[in-house]
Amino acid sequence: MGKHILLLPLGLSLLMSSLLALQCFRCISFDSTGFCYVGRHICQTYPDEICAWVVVTTRDGKFVYGNQSCAECNATTVEHGSLIVSTNCCSATPFCNMVHR
């Protein structure tokens, strides 16, 4: 009987963490249209993670690279030489990191 009482808090903890987790798109590489052509999956966030996507463009707006993931995320835009790297974050709804281009 004592074992069952100990398992109850563990089970409730696992249930709560799965309810609080957010599902996001995960893609190693997508093209300029948002089509994932390498590593298309769904990920589930861990504590402190949200949905994220990164887009790399040239200064004149030409698409170079993009990916999607579950990650600890800070929205930033950084210029690196002739490239602009934009990191985007969201947590409002599941799969909020869908890319529309």
From Swiss-Prot:
Its main location: secreted. It is found in: Secreted. Residues 22-99 form the UPAR/Ly6 domain. The keyword Disulfide bond applies. Keywords: Disulfide bond, Secreted, Signal. Disulfide bonds join C24-C51, C27-C36, C43-C70, C73-C89, C90-C96. The keyword Signal applies. InterPro entries: LY6_UPA_recep-like. It holds the Pfam family UPAR_LY6. Residues 1-21 form the signal peptide. GO terms for cellular component: extracellular region; plasma membrane. GO terms for molecular function: complement binding. This is Urinary protein 3. It comes from Rattus norvegicus (Rat). The lineage of its organism: Eukaryota, Metazoa, Chordata, Craniata, Vertebrata.
